[in-house]
């Protein structure tokens, strides 16, 4: 006897199982992973999204919650499983999984614990999606992007870190607040390490092509009477403040990652400050990943924009690189 489906629908052709052209996987369904997933879904960037985690109940719950909202989304396939088989043929894989820093734990110890986690995750991604681009979001992001690059064996254009994309967004927001404008009209770059030693490029800060350093030669320095350097100080401190208030950060980084994903799945060739391998640039001699303005396309990271940095900005970048290398060179089993 025919089912309701058989009575309702007359098949015309066989569905192709490999029809997805822009599948995205998110590894880790914590606060950050889900913010990334929801931001990607709401921006309608993919026809297929896969979620992976070791916590099966949480994973199933998050998937069900999203599926119950399918009517309001335009992503026909939302899947979740602890088996990486469901991630097969992803174009972009977002890695948010990792250990959290415990009270009193050294950064090196945290990184080493994350190395051990990544040694399980990354080979699975490579196995099922050998042509994907990996966006590393887990912290400390610059070091874990290096770790991912080493473990994956991928070319450096297909392993990026979310890096200073968020730092720069925070910088532009705070700059906009000070000027009474929208962040999209305020241009400025934060480069280097995602975190305490990031480098604000005051020489390039502008609105409508008007360089703020031309209007205020002391901008960003200790001599500046308007205290613009506080803008960068707030960028560095903002994550700590949000964590103190709500326990974690997730929405801004989720939106930031969706923006990076869009540039790649739509082949936009937009420029973003993301973490890339900087050996050979600005006099940096070690294999470290730092944020520079990078062009993102369907092939991953295809170009780096050579900014005309001032000597003190280059010195800060090199110092960032040295700090990271001192941790990386101590890592075991890479």
From Swiss-Prot:
Q: Name one Pfam family in it.
A: Ldh_1_C
Q: Which GO terms describe its biological process?
A: lactate metabolic process
Q: What are the annotated GO cellular component locations?
A: cytoplasm
- Cross-referenced InterPro entries, in alphabetical order? L-lactate/malate_DH, L-lactate_DH, L-lactate_DH_AS, Lactate/malate_DH_C, Lactate/malate_DH_N, Lactate_DH/Glyco_Ohase_4_C, NAD(P)-bd_dom_sf
- Pathway note: Fermentation; pyruvate fermentation to lactate; (S)-lactate from pyruvate: step 1/1
The active site lies at 194
Q: Where in the cell is it found?
A: Cytoplasm
Major enzyme class:
oxidoreductase
**Catalytic activities:** (S)-lactate + NAD(+) = pyruvate + NADH + H(+)
GO terms for molecular function, please?
Answer: L-lactate dehydrogenase activity
Q: Assembly and interactions?
A: Homotetramer.
Q: What does this protein do?
A: Interconverts simultaneously and stereospecifically pyruvate and lactate with concomitant interconversion of NADH and NAD(+).
Q: What HAMAP family does this protein's entry cite?
A: Lactate_dehydrog
What name goes with this protein? L-lactate dehydrogenase B chain
Q: Print the organism lineage.
A: Eukaryota, Metazoa, Chordata, Craniata, Vertebrata
Name of the gene: ldhb
